[in-house]
């Protein structure tokens, strides 16, 4: 199953997340199919998600994680 979820990048105590499309069987930071945005939880908070690609992947059956659903509403 294809899922849209966050993968962590950044460094220790300075998280930065990429919004990616990946196979649900892959590890959190394993390979991904496509990167469709990013999320910076530190001040100033910053969210960018490509809505066109998000809608495409949802259209072909990708499921979103709970966190990505909440973030996509804010973006």
Curated annotation (Swiss-Prot):
Pfam family for this entry, one: Ribosomal_S16
Lineage summary: Bacteria, Pseudomonadati, Campylobacterota, Epsilonproteobacteria, Campylobacterales
Keyword line: Ribonucleoprotein, Ribosomal protein
Superkingdom of origin organism: Bacteria
Transmembrane segments: none
Entry's Gene Ontology molecular function annotations: structural constituent of ribosome
Name assigned to this protein: Small ribosomal subunit protein bS16
Biological process per Gene Ontology, one example term: translation
SUPFAM superfamilies according to UniProt: Ribosomal protein S16
Cellular component terms (Gene Ontology): cytoplasm; small ribosomal subunit
Family: Belongs to the bacterial ribosomal protein bS16 family.
UniProt keyword Ribonucleoprotein, yes or no: yes
UniProt keyword annotation of Transmembrane helix present: no
């Amino acid at each position: 199953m294809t899922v849209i979820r966050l993968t962590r990048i950044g460094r220790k105590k300075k998280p930065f997340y990429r919004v990616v499309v990946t196979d649900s069987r892959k590890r959190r930071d394993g390979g991904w199919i496509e990167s469709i945005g990013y999320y910076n939880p530190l001040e100033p908070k910053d969210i960018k998600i490509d809505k066109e690609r998000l809608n495409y992947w949802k259209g072909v059956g990708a499921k979103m994680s709970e966190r990505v659903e909440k973030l996509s509403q804010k973006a």
